[in-house]
Amino acid sequence: MARLFDHYKNIVIKELIQQFNYKTVMQVPKITKITLNMGVGEAAVDKKIMENAVSDLEKISAQKPIITKAKKSIATFKIRQGYPVGCMVTLRGIKMYEFLDRLVSIAIPRIRDFRGIGGKGFDGHGNFNMGIKEQIIFPEIDYDKIDKLRGLNITMTTTAKTDIEAKALLSAFKFPFKN
C-alpha cells in the first residue's frame, strides 16, 4: 500500500471533512489521475530524441508512455500531420500515489532556487497544472546519461469542485505552495 494513500485515508479525509463541513466521506475530494506530458518538438528532425524522451518519462513514471502525434501540419514548425511531437503517461491508483510521494518528498526539494509552487496553476474546476524545467530533479534519471535537459508538464485531476478545495487537498499531501 502506498504511504500517501494511507495518509489520505487516515488523516486527509478527516481534515477536509472538518474544514469544509462535508456530510459524507464521498464528498471529500480526491486525486483521480496524474498526467505527465513531455513535448518534444525536435523529434520531427531526429527520431533518437523521441526515444530518449520516452525512456526518461518511463523511468520517471515507472509506466510506458504513449507517443503523441501532431493533429495537423504546421509549415513554420516543419511538422506534418501524424509526426511524433511528444509523449505522455497517465498514472492512476497506487502508481499515482507512489509518484506523488516521490514528487513531493524527493523531486521538488531538488529544484534549484525553489521557493514554493505558485497558486496560479489551478484551472477553476479543481485541477492543478505545474511545469518542471529539468527532468534531472527525479532520482531515477542519471545525469550522465541524458542527452538534453527537457521539461515536463504535470497535471493533477481531482474531484474537487473549486480551486480552494483542490488547494486544501494538495496542501494536506504536504505540497509546498507559496504563502
From Swiss-Prot:
Keyword annotations: Ribonucleoprotein, Ribosomal protein, RNA-binding, rRNA-binding, tRNA-binding
Protein name: Large ribosomal subunit protein uL5
GO BP, one annotated term: translation
NCBIfam families in the cross-refs: PRK00010.1 (NF000585)
Subunit relationships: Part of the 50S ribosomal subunit; part of the 5S rRNA/L5/L18/L25 subcomplex. Contacts the 5S rRNA and the P site tRNA. Forms a bridge to the 30S subunit in the 70S ribosome.
Family stated for the protein in its record: Belongs to the universal ribosomal protein uL5 family.
SUPFAM superfamilies in the record: RL5-like
One Gene Ontology term, aspect cellular component: ribosome
InterPro entries linked to this entry: Ribosomal_uL5, Ribosomal_uL5_bac-type, Ribosomal_uL5_C, Ribosomal_uL5_dom_sf, Ribosomal_uL5_N
This protein's encoding gene: rplE
GO terms for MF: rRNA binding; structural constituent of ribosome; tRNA binding
Superkingdom field: Bacteria
Pfam families xref list: Ribosomal_L5 (PF00281), Ribosomal_L5_C (PF00673)
Functional summary from the UniProt entry: This is one of the proteins that bind and probably mediate the attachment of the 5S RNA into the large ribosomal subunit, where it forms part of the central protuberance. In the 70S ribosome it contacts protein S13 of the 30S subunit (bridge B1b), connecting the 2 subunits; this bridge is implicated in subunit movement. Contacts the P site tRNA; the 5S rRNA and some of its associated proteins might help stabilize positioning of ribosome-bound tRNAs.
